[in-house]
Amino acid sequence: MKTEGEKLVADTDNFIKETLAKYPNLAGKSVAMCYINAADLSNFSVYRTADPRGAYLTDLGFTFPEKIEAQAQDKNAFYVQISAELAVESLSDTDIIITYGDDKTIAALQKDAIFSKVPAVKEGRVVVLDSNGNLAAACNPSVLSVKAELVNYLDAINAVVK
């Protein structure tokens, strides 16, 4: 059983490496995996690398935005909650925002007086993962989900890169 598990992990690592090679323009981009409630834009949360969602992105070669990390009071916390008033400053070094939501999320961000000034929002570099969809679950990876959804996840991210 141990040997089979090690082989599965090695095969998955190879799959990730081969898949990432098809997306060279994503390498080194800063990405914030957020929770933004379009019905209440008074604050938002960003999952840090202590959370599997944030760690997965750094494992895929993305960087974690420094200005978000600077907001973290507790360096062991899995997320940092930020007041909307600080959104523009906090997300100014973020190339891509990923958030859960629906087909109304981007429109809500673009109409909001503050979030509309965030460079990634203004320039259309926001990936919205359907809260009830496979990608929303797959951004919390397992060795079994990676092969099923990695290409779809990277395609969604790649689609917003300018």
Language-model segments: which ranges?
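Alpha-helical, coiled-coil/dimerization segments enriched in small aliphatic residues
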Residues: 43-80, 134
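Short helices/loops that flank or line small-molecule/ion binding pockets
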Residues: 81-93
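N-terminal post-signal-peptidase region of extra-cytosolic proteins
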Residues: 77-84, 111
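Short secondary-structure boundary/capping segments
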Residues: 23, 54, 117-119
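Extracytoplasmic substrate-binding proteins
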Residues: 1-41, 136-162
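Short, conserved beta-strand edge motifs with alternating hydrophobic and charged residues
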Residues: 30-36, 67-68, 98-100
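Structured C-terminal subdomain patch of bacterial secreted/periplasmic proteins
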Residues: 92-162
